[in-house]
């Protein structure tokens, strides 16, 4: 079954997560219209190869045209309009940047796959009694459901008792007025006095029964409000707080957050019960106005009951106003809470009280740093204005599940300029990527005579003015959400708390697993721990400061740990994603471990790891070989950076890599990917066939072109290159490269510099095993 069809069969909570994957940058309508074609393309490859991305993008436009023709035949005006608008947007946004749309689509497809896996796992675990976490959660939810049912039942029981009291009071009122009327009209003789006393006794008995029932109802109302308070505290302080914490974790790459639908149903049910109870308390006031007496419990307790129920309802409504989707730039979906000035970002708020009468009644206004203006000025932080559509009315039509929400899609930030370039205080102690800002959402609710001011805010965001600030800004978001669940601590980085390696390790692994199919292994994390903390045996519980993580340079390096790691993450996502997902890249491994595992392997065995000396991120391969005397040697090639991988895929580099031996013969030192996977089996499928790379010659051409192939070559010695069959210009480049190579990374055995050149495939090259 197609992936898109499987997704549409998921539960509502998963469909809401699916909805959150899509935005204007890649509309869900397009995913729906072209589902089979989209799933048939290799978007991951297109995201790493610009020429292929351009081809796929133009094919996408062609598919849109074909679909438009179908809608034209069906006279579907709405779909025609939407598809035309989508095509115009894609052309304006991605025509010059086709790799961006490829990355976005690849990311969406991968997230869809993860969503299906999560749903399948949850379905399997749902029936397993031996799964402790699932059992605890289910039991807790069942208890909450029981408490809510109990509240609803008590409300209904009170409703019946109120009717009984009202009937009894009407009888009492009628008999009392009748007796009074008869007493005024008749002479009070002996017989009449006896009858009157008898009727008075009956009235006293009725009043006693009425008083008992009133006291019972007042007591039950007080108990009901206490039960509501308990359920409300469980919902807001536990369930909703847990959801908000999970949202924080999901923002920094952790497991996806659960859907709000169930929580919305619980809160809505409680709110309905509270409003019904408030009406019952108002009914008590009506009863009091008809019949009152000395010691009336309604007079004594009704004002307090009214105050309690109103306070409960107000607090519930305020807690139910949440940010369902945190601020995020559509072009950087994997890094929410970082906003660049002048670039649109999106966010979504939701009211978890689903009252149809509130549809299109709540106007939401957005502002930034509403409550921290004075603090921001003291800290020297920048100030911003929100531009774009910063007001919107909540409605139930825009959400798939009919929730009361408002999505802001066209917000931007602009810095308020002042005389010193925007900083309110030149002596500010925080750098801009450590400044935290809050985006606030406000509205007013008028419901059943109550006016309630609602306000919620986003998690703290970092505002940047240049995309080069993204790495440090994202580090701030990671550190904040890793170490605190305080949603408003904008002064967090004035004295940032210390984290433990266990916390940092989990978050670092999330940075890979959230954007790829593979997190970090224990061995890879141990290597990273050594980079941060130095040699050790057990890093559990070791403390890591914010400065150590992000600001201080690593020992012997001119850059910090996070800058180095973030560039590797970017390298993986953009250039070697498929190889990483396959598990072919060992990545983080110490030199000692590298030598230990390779030295026992046959010559030609190699592994792939990340460069430790390249600030911009580099990947290299290390292999084992035997020298003339039979001694084992470990060799590493100079790391390949993003600039080189833009021109040739890493798989093609590995498949074509050669060493020029002393006799000027090209040989391949790479045979088996560790531990024993044949190179062709591992990387062959990621190399484009030569028939696609070299178009056939024009039959009418007098002299057909010779086919060429780009390969990477490492000369053993520059003096031995004079006999290599290549052009003088290529030879000069090779000589210059061999004499002037810089920035090489030392290895245990030796260091090799490689040159990529274009070799003619003619008879002179027959001795080269290509």
UniProtKB/Swiss-Prot annotation:
Binding partners and assembly: Forms a homodimer or a heterodimer with a related family member (at least STAT1). Component of a promoter-binding complex composed of STAT3, NFATC3 and NFATC4; complex formation is enhanced by calcineurin. Interacts with IL31RA, NCOA1, PELP1, SIPAR, SOCS7, STATIP1 and TMF1. Interacts with IL23R in presence of IL23. Interacts (via SH2 domain) with NLK. Interacts with ARL2BP; the interaction is enhanced by LIF and JAK1 expression. Interacts with KPNA4 and KPNA5; KPNA4 may be the primary mediator of nuclear import.
Species: Sus scrofa (Pig)
Name of the featured protein: Signal transducer and activator of transcription 3
SH2 domain location: 580-670
SMART domains in UniProt: STAT_int
Entry keyword set: Acetylation, Activator, Cytoplasm, DNA-binding, Nucleus, Phosphoprotein, SH2 domain, Transcription, Transcription regulation
InterPro entries: p53-like_TF_DNA-bd_sf, SH2, SH2_dom_sf, STAT, STAT3_SH2, STAT_linker, STAT_N_sf, STAT_TF_alpha
PTM characteristics: Activated through tyrosine phosphorylation by BMX. Tyrosine phosphorylated in response to IL6, IL11, CNTF, LIF, KITLG/SCF, CSF1, EGF, PDGF, IFN-alpha and OSM. Activated KIT promotes phosphorylation on tyrosine residues and subsequent translocation to the nucleus. Tyrosine phosphorylated in response to constitutively activated FGFR1, FGFR2, FGFR3 and FGFR4. Phosphorylated on serine upon DNA damage, probably by ATM or ATR. Serine phosphorylation is important for the formation of stable DNA-binding STAT3 homodimers and maximal transcriptional activity. Acetylated on lysine residues by EP300/p300, promoting its activation. Acetylation at Lys-49 and Lys-87 by EP300/p300 promotes its activation. Acetylation at Lys-87 by EP300/p300 promotes its association with BRD2 and recruitment to chromatin. Deacetylated at Lys-49 and Lys-87 by HDAC1. Acetylation at Lys-685 by EP300/p300 promotes its homodimerization and activation. Deacetylated at Lys-685 by HDAC3. Acetylated on lysine residues by CREBBP. Deacetylation by LOXL3 leads to disrupt STAT3 dimerization and inhibit STAT3 transcription activity.
A GO BP annotation: cell surface receptor signaling pathway via JAK-STAT
GO cellular component term of the entry, any: plasma membrane
Recorded superkingdom: Eukaryota
Purpose: Signal transducer and transcription activator that mediates cellular responses to interleukins, KITLG/SCF, LEP and other growth factors. Once activated, recruits coactivators, such as NCOA1 or MED1, to the promoter region of the target gene. May mediate cellular responses to activated FGFR1, FGFR2, FGFR3 and FGFR4. Upon activation of IL6ST/gp130 signaling by interleukin-6 (IL6), binds to the IL6-responsive elements identified in the promoters of various acute-phase protein genes. Activated by IL31 through IL31RA.
GO molecular function: chromatin DNA binding; DNA binding; DNA-binding transcription factor activity; DNA-binding transcription factor activity, RNA polymerase II-specific; protein dimerization activity; protein homodimerization activity; protein kinase binding; RNA polymerase II cis-regulatory region sequence-specific DNA binding
Residues that bear Allysine: 601, 615, 631, 685
Presence of the UniProt keyword Cytoplasm in the record: yes
């Amino acid at each position: 079954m197609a992936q898109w069809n499987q997704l549409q069969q998921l539960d509502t909570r998963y469909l809401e997560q699916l909805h959150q994957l899509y935005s204007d940058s890649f509309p869900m309508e397009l995913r729906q219209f072209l589902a089979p074609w989209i799933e048939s393309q290799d978007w991951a490859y297109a995201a790493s190869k610009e020429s292929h991305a351009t081809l796929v993008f133009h094919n996408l436009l062609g598919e849109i045209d074909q679909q438009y023709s179908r809608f034209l035949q069906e006279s579907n005006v709405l779909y025609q309009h939407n598809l035309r608008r989508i095509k115009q947007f894609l052309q304006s946004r991605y025509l010059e940047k086709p790799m961006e749309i490829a990355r976005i689509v690849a990311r969406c497809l991968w997230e869809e796959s993860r969503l299906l896996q999560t749903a399948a796992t949850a379905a399997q675990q749902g029936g397993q009694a031996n799964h402790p976490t699932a059992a605890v959660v289910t039991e807790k939810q069942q208890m909450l459901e029981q408490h809510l049912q109990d509240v609803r039942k008590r409300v209904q029981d009170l409703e019946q008792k109120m009717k009984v009291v009202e009937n009894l009071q009407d009888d009492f009122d009628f008999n009392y007025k009748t007796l009074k009327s008869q007493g005024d009209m008749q002479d009070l003789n002996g017989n009449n006095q006896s009858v009157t006393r008898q009727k008075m006794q009956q009235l006293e008995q009725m009043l006693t029964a009425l008083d008992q029932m009133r006291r019972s109802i007042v007591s039950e109302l007080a108990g009901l409000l206490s039960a509501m308070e308990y359920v409300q505290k469980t919902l807001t302080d536990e369930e909703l707080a847990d959801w908000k914490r999970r949202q924080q974790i999901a923002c920094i790459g952790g497991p996806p957050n659960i859907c709000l639908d169930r929580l919305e149903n619980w809160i809505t049910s409680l709110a309905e019960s509270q409003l019904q109870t408030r009406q019952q308390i108002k009914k008590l006031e009506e009863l009091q106005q008809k019949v009152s007496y000395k010691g009336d419990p309604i007079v004594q307790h009704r004002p307090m009951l009214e105050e309690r129920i109103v306070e409960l309802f107000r607090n519930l409504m305020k807690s139910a106003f949440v940010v369902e989707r945190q601020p995020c730039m559509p072009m950087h979906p994997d890094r929410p809470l970082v906003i660049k000035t002048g670039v649109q970002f999106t966010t979504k708020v939701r009211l978890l009280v689903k009252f149809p009468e509130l549809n299109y009644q709540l106007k939401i206004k957005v502002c930034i740093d509403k409550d921290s203006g004075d603090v921001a000025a003291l800290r020297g932080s920048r100030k911003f204005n929100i531009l774009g559509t910063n007001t919107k009315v909540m409605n139930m039509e825009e959400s798939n599940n009919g929730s009361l929400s408002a999505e802001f899609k066209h917000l931007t930030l602009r810095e308020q300029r002042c005389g010193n370039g925007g900083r309110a205080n030149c002596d500010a102690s925080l750098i801009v990527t450590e400044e935290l800002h809050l985006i606030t959402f406000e509205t007013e609710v008028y419901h059943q005579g109550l006016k309630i001011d609602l306000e919620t805010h986003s998690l703290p965001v970092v505002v940047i003015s240049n995309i080069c600030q993204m790495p440090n800004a994202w580090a701030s978001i990671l550190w904040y959400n890793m170490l605190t669940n305080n949603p408003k601590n904008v002064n967090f980085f004035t004295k940032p708390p210390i984290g433990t390696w266990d916390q940092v390790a989990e978050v670092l692994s999330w940075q890979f697993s959230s954007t790829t199919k593979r997190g970090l292994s224990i061995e890879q994390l141990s290597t990273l721990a050594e980079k941060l903390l130095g040699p050790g045996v057990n890093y559990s519980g070791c403390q890591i400061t914010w400065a150590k993580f992000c600001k201080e340079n690593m020992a012997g390096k001119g850059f910090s740990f996070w800058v180095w790691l973030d560039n590797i993450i970017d390298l993986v996502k953009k250039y070697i994603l498929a190889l990483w997902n396959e598990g072919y890249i060992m990545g983080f491994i110490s030199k000692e471990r590298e030598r230990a595992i390779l030295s026992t392997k046959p010559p030609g065995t190699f592994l792939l790891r990340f460069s430790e000396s390249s600030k911009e991120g580099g990947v290299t391969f290390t292999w084992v070989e035997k020298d003339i005397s039979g001694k084992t040697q470990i060799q590493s090639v100079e790391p390949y950076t993003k600039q080189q991988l833009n021109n040739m895929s890493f798989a093609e580099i590995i498949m074509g890599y050669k060493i020029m031996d002393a006799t000027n013969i090209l040989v391949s030192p790479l045979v088996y990917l560790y531990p024993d996977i044949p190179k062709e089996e591992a990387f062959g499928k990621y190399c484009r066939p030569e028939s696609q790379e070299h178009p056939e010659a024009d039959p009418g051409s007098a002299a057909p072109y010779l086919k060429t192939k780009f390969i990477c070559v490492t000369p053993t010695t520059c003096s031995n290159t004079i006999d290599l069959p290549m052009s003088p210009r290529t030879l000069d480049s090779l000589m210059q490269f061999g004499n002037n190579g810089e920035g090489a990374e030392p290895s245990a055995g030796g260091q090799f510099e490689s040159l990529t050149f274009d070799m003619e495939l003619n008879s002179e090259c027959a001795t080269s095993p290509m």
